Amino acid sequence: MKLMVFDLDGTLLNTLPDLTDSVNYAMQTLGLLTYTQAEVAQMVGSGMTVTLTRALGKQNLDYLAEAKKLQAEYYAEHCNDKTAPFDGVTDMLQTLAANGIAVAVYSNKDQPFAEATCAKQFGTLVPYVVGTGPDGVIKPDATRLLALTQRIGADRCLYCGDSDVDVLTARNAVMPCVSVTWGYRTRKQLVESGATILCDTPDQVLQYAQKYFA
């Protein structure tokens, strides 16, 4: 079975507007400084606990538990207000499916958020969604991803993401990694993290996948 595994935030979906709003809701409610989307973009990628830890800074870490509660409450209601696929992503997923390549998402979002977001944005185009479970284990740990590949019998896999975390995740899963440059890390950051296959558009990702799985 051929399987293409995608990161979600910054790879398939531009979730940054809603993520920024949710972080800023927590920060503002606590009477703390808020952030621009560009600033939040550099905080995301390792789960919301890490994002909020970065947002709060060392001097405000006592607020972490409350910030997590506030952010989660807001995001549950607004996680798809402004979120949308990047241009060309839906067509890419449709073509992959037509070529007999199954699609999975491997995300640091909590499982319910990951499932709800994929269902709303992509319907049946993403049949396999793996988010963070109750144990709180996040990428770059590849345990949940490898469990999925074993469960569905995927023996040829390709990983695609937009961050250094994804490069490490693919390495831990022993999968080739396609790094996309339209997400929340710069090309320079990706190269410095060890990325060797870089694509600037979903069409380039599709072309690489078609050659890889040929």
What residue ranges belong to the model's regions?
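Substrate-recognition element of Asp-dependent hydrolases with the DxDx(T/V) motif
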Residues: 92-119
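Nucleotide-sugar donor-binding loop of glycosyltransferases
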Residues: 181
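N-terminal helical cap/lid subdomain that shapes the substrate entry/recognition surface
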Residues: 1-91, 99, 112
